């Protein structure tokens, strides 16, 4: 019966997953139908606009060329008409001289003949007919204004839709996730010299496998990529995976997106568990601030709840002006809250295997600050590093400045400048807990031990504040140092 029940549960789970996939696909099909209508209307509108632009351009060219013909015809007509008028006048003058010369020749016996002959000779010399060019000033040939649009007609006949770039193919073998950076590499299935740039889109997700259509996280867009690879830097991996897709663009149009891929982005994510914190610590997600009145405010509220001390605080009293620490639900319960001089707060995520890395930046003016790890069983009165259940690096700015590594109430003074940002690397299976200058990755100290219980990130602060950064991968520099064995030293054995 139990086996049948378990088999039925598996069937139900399989059906539920399949139903979700089908629903997602139905949503995709409906969205595609809407997109087909919208996109076809858009491209039809664009096509009509392009042809209208061509019609307008051809009409403008036609008007301009007709105007050129009309201007050339008017200019030639004007020149020929002027030349015709001049020739007509010259011909009339020449005919008059010819008639006069014939008449004078017939009157050779007249005593006026010599004088008349001389006048005719002088008239011929000055006659327009002998100064007139008998070559037309312009040609009647209009061949320079003829056109042959055969080539252009062929070009118009060759009009077609733009060639769309092929969808790129993302090369998972060459892509890399490391140091909170993602290098994505892709290639084109066919050589295309007209590609101008690429567009990369990515988003965070907690779901493995093909990207889902309905996601809470939006696609982030990077445009103008000229190469077939791109590196995203300075990422915070606060989700388990990232989706990626790429499309190619030429000068006019973008192609289809590549098949989306999902890359795993392993990193250690946790928040501070406010329910474990000392009452003098004001906890807000990943930051902590010392609150000297925190405990007193809680005591006042507790008495008011019990019906004791119902007298209201003065309007300007610290108790009224200081808010209580922010609380978060946790399995530890209120009874396990750190108290007395253990100004401690723990992370909310257990470390029970693998390698993990996080960083913490503390206020340099803090009188005391500590960072490390602890077993969940760390007592509520116990301070970090003073029991066998915790390991930490401790900075003390009160009275005398000190920078120490602490475990099981043993202390090692560190001979190194105190950085304002510390990196913590925990390799659970190897039993290594290393502290680094987060900026330079200089090793400050390494505990080498054997962890017998799951660990929690642990922090302590007195009269100060700090900010934790999670979602970080183990830096490559840290891995290299660990492989070379330079992260350990014989002097650390006394604190294991």
Curated annotation (Swiss-Prot):
One of its GO terms (molecular function) is microtubule binding. It holds the Pfam family SPRY. Residues 301-336 are annotated as: Disordered. Residues 4-99 form a coiled coil. Residues 164-268 form the Fibronectin type-III domain. SUPFAM superfamilies: Concanavalin A-like lectins/glucanases (SSF49899), Fibronectin type III (SSF49265). Residues 268-477 form the B30.2/SPRY domain. May be involved in microtubule organization and stabilization. This is Fibronectin type III and SPRY domain-containing protein 1. It comes from Homo sapiens (Human). The lineage of its organism: Eukaryota, Metazoa, Chordata, Craniata, Vertebrata. The gene is FSD1.
